[in-house]
């Protein structure tokens, strides 16, 4: 099956075909992002499709809720695929995991109505960006957090973050190569939380632009370090120019932690993740 490229899942399932949704978590450190790449370049999508194809004994193609970049992680990714093959839900979880590398795991499986779509049915997405704030770099959390040796003032970061809440043109926070049709997005919350030596940016919105969370993290860390005034976040936002936005933060600390769907789909909600933040309270809203 190495030479078979699975077909992409359709917009809606055909007659006689089941639409299956899966919850996925992965450590993105050794992958060139979610999306399937050219032969020989590791991606999360390729590894998952290969494992699912072994369980189904035929090619399987998946669609995800949000494509993550190289070295970005997920504890709450959602995908769907269509298949005429009948397998118990346990097989889609346990059987697929048996064929996946240790840094990718299927967490749940559900049979979905034909109109469910992992990407287009989503109402909101939530990310966490974990910053290890200490003079000494963390060996055990290498590639799982972003290390910032400068003392960060979380109070300044919190105050600056509030200007990002609501509906705005986020052009200043999008990557130059971003292909989104509109830079206007709605952020439901932008919070800074403390967990030991970790500062966690917790951000929930209807949709995100390419590199948007990492660019926001870069601006907030610059303000937290005292290198820019609190008002700089507002200035960057209003500039609507990526050149005003400063540095893009490293990918290692970024996690897609939850994708939210209408209640009719009754999808499970696990812990937000990542695992080392299990003691951090979930703030709803």
Swiss-Prot record:
The active site is at residue 69. It comes from the Bacteria. It is an enzyme of class 5 (isomerase). It catalyses: uridine(38/39/40) in tRNA = pseudouridine(38/39/40) in tRNA. InterPro entries: PsdUridine_synth_cat_dom_sf (IPR020103), PsdUridine_synth_TruA (IPR001406), PsdUridine_synth_TruA_a/b_dom (IPR020097), PsdUridine_synth_TruA_C (IPR020095), TruA/RsuA/RluB/E/F_N (IPR020094). Substrate binds at residue 127. One of its GO terms (molecular function) is tRNA pseudouridine(38-40) synthase activity. It holds the Pfam family PseudoU_synth_1. Formation of pseudouridine at positions 38, 39 and 40 in the anticodon stem and loop of transfer RNAs. Belongs to the tRNA pseudouridine synthase TruA family. This is tRNA pseudouridine synthase A. It comes from Pseudomonas aeruginosa (strain ATCC 15692 / DSM 22644 / CIP 104116 / JCM 14847 / LMG 12228 / 1C / PRS 101 / PAO1).
């Amino acid at each position: 099956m190495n030479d078979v490229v699975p077909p992409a899942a359709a917009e809606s399932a055909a007659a006689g075909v089941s639409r299956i949704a899966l919850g996925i978590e992965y450590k993105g450190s050794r992958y060139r992002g979610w999306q399937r790449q050219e032969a020989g370049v590791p991606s999360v999508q390729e590894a998952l499709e290969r494992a699912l194809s072994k369980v189904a004994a035929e090619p399987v193609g998946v669609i995800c809720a949000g494509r993550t970049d190289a070295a970005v992680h997920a504890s709450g990714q959602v995908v769907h695929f269509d298949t005429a093959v009948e397998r118990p839900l346990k097989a889609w979880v346990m059987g697929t995991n048996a064929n996946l590398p240790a840094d990718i795991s299927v967490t749940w499986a559900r049979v979905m109505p034909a109109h469910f779509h992992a990407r287009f049915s989503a109402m909101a997405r939530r990310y966490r960006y974990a910053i290890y704030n200490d003079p000494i770099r963390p060996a055990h959390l290498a590639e799982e957090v972003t290390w910032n040796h400068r003392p960060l003032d979380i109070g300044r970061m919190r105050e600056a973050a509030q200007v990002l809440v609501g509906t705005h043109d986020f052009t200043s926070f999008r990557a130059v190569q971003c292909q989104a049709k509109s830079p206007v997005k709605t952020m439901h919350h932008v919070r800074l939380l403390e967990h030991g030596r970790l500062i966690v940016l917790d951000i929930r919105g209807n949709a995100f632009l390419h590199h948007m969370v990492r660019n926001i993290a870069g601006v907030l860390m610059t303000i937290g370090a005292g290198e820019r005034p609190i008002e700089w976040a507002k200035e960057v936002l209003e500039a609507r120019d990526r050149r005003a936005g400063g540095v893009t933060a490293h990918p290692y600390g970024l996690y897609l932690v939850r994708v939210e769907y209408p209640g009719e789909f009754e999808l499970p909600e696990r812990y937000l993740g990542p695992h080392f933040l299990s003691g951090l309270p979930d703030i709803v809203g």
